């Protein structure tokens, strides 16, 4: 089975594109997911994944690239969530839940009438990734990682202690919006591998697993990116070998990593002992 997969990589260009794209998305989603976890915004990935679907539908209606509509609606959703949180007594999780409600059936009907398979939009179809899509994913991934590296310190401060960051003159809201832009970019590019439904799991699960082991944000990001890439490789292998949805296999593999780590991670075991009455 492994030999067949390796032979397929050597023979089929589409499988090479799928592997490179899956690894790129796994790495960048793992890195961005760490900041989402630390900020307590795990629902944001799910909210944006719901928000981009009407953007995809509108793109098909207008006959433009779905990437444009998805990015526009994703950014609009992230801005609205932040605005509602900052200018009302409504908490961010409530705003995220509200913006996750936009009648998916009507948007799905519009997409279903297009030439694109609705199943591929909802659950991804990484085996159909073209050269242009692969290079766009790599370009977005490199840009996102570069921004994180260059602005690591302010992103770190605003994630752990926004009040302290504000007192130090750091523009907390600016970096929050920047992170939302990065999250939207990653969510839209991840549509090709896992689809809109499973984007949140791709963002959160590797980061949550890494959180159980890491003692610093750098180590958490590196481990999360590594786990995301490994889950992508194994998920692609399983999906290709057994002819099942690759996106679901990637997410399921990542979930297995988390479940195993939940029971064996040193930090988790220490926490259990701390909670024990004996």
From Swiss-Prot:
InterPro entries: ABC_BtuC-like (IPR037294), ABC_TroCD (IPR001626). The chain crosses the membrane at residues 18-38, 40-60, 61-81, 136-156, 172-192, 194-214, 220-240, 244-264. It comes from the Bacteria. The keyword Transport applies. It is found in: Cell membrane. Keywords: Cell membrane, Membrane, Transmembrane, Transmembrane helix, Transport. It is a multi-pass membrane protein. GO terms for cellular component: ATP-binding cassette (ABC) transporter complex. SUPFAM superfamilies: ABC transporter involved in vitamin B12 uptake, BtuC. It holds the Pfam family ABC-3. GO terms for biological process: response to zinc ion; transmembrane transport. Belongs to the ABC-3 integral membrane protein family. PANTHER family: ABC-TRANSPORTER METAL-BINDING PROTEIN (PTHR30477), IRON TRANSPORT SYSTEM MEMBRANE PROTEIN HI_0360-RELATED (PTHR30477:SF13). Part of an ABC transporter complex involved in manganese import. This is Manganese import system permease protein ScaB. It comes from Streptococcus pneumoniae.
């Amino acid at each position: 089975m492994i030999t067949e997969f390796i032979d397929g990589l050597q023979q089929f260009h589409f499988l090479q594109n799928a592997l490179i794209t899956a690894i790129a998305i796994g790495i960048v989603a793992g890195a961005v997911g760490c900041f989402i976890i630390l900020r307590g915004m795990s629902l944001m990935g799910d909210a944006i994944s719901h928000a981009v679907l009407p953007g995809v539908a509108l793109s098909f209606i207008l006959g433009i690239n779905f990437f444009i509509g998805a990015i526009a609606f994703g950014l609009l959703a992230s801005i609205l969530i932040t605005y509602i949180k900052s200018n009302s007594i409504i908490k961010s999780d409530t705003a995220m839940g509200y913006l996750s409600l936009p009648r998916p059936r009507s948007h799905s009907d519009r997409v279903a009438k297009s030439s694109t398979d609705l199943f591929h939009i909802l659950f991804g179809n990484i085996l159909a990734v073209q050269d242009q899509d692969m290079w766009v994913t790599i370009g977005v991934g490199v840009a996102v990682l570069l921004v994180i590296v260059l602005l690591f310190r302010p992103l770190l401060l605003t994630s752990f202690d926004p009040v302290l960051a504000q007192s130090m003159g750091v523009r907390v809201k600016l970096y929050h919006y920047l992170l939302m832009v990065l999250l939207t970019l990653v969510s839209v590019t991840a549509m090709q591998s896992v689809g809109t439904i499973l984007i949140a799991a791709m963002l959160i699960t590797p980061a949550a697993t890494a959180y159980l082991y890491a003692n610093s944000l750098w180590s958490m990001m590196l481990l999360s990116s590594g786990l995301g890439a490994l889950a992508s490789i194994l998920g692609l292998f399983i999906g290709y070998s057994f002819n099942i949805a690759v996106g679901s296999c990637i997410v399921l593999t990542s979930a297995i990593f988390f479940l195993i780590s939940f029971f064996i991670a040193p930090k988790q075991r220490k926490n259990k002992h701390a909670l024990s009455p004996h």
